[in-house]
């Protein structure tokens, strides 16, 4: 019996990623509240047409009252063609701090009941950064992070109105001991704790991520 089977491959695009299928033009979707909308170009790099499915995904900490709605959640994209996907921002009150969500783009190839081949659908997963109209632009958001000793733990907090993104690992200085956090982002006014490996260290070294998810130069700050 002839069978046609489709598998989905899930790709998180946060740094430089090479991929096939439906490929976004950038590694992050930036949304400005002033405009009330955003758009991104998606290219179908396959040699066949596919249906492009666009889905906004809330993080566990996301503000569910802030909604970003794709105007065309499902659309056919021909082979080699570029499709612009537009999003509308909906919020009940003006935003005071940045919001982080995710968006997935998945290309579903046409079904051929007479074929026995196995096809693979690629799902791209990008961060969505929503910036309030009243908040000044800030490129170096990581400088707002506060690192404090608390017993045998380090408490890392983000008291700012900005989303901060960084790599998972960091070092405490001068010992050079390595530590790690459990996620690569800090939403505004959130904090986390991790193990303190050397109580005498007074500095922290880590690598922040740019707005587009690229790893920046190392940054050193106080461990209080």
Swiss-Prot record:
Single GO molecular function: protein folding chaperone
Location(s) in or outside the cell: Periplasm
Pfam families in the cross-refs: PapD_N (PF00345)
Gene3D superfamilies in the record: Immunoglobulins
GO cellular component assignments: outer membrane-bounded periplasmic space
UniProtKB keywords: Chaperone, Fimbrium biogenesis, Immunoglobulin domain, Periplasm, Signal
Family designation: Belongs to the periplasmic pilus chaperone family.
Protein name: Uncharacterized fimbrial chaperone YhcA
Originating gene: yhcA
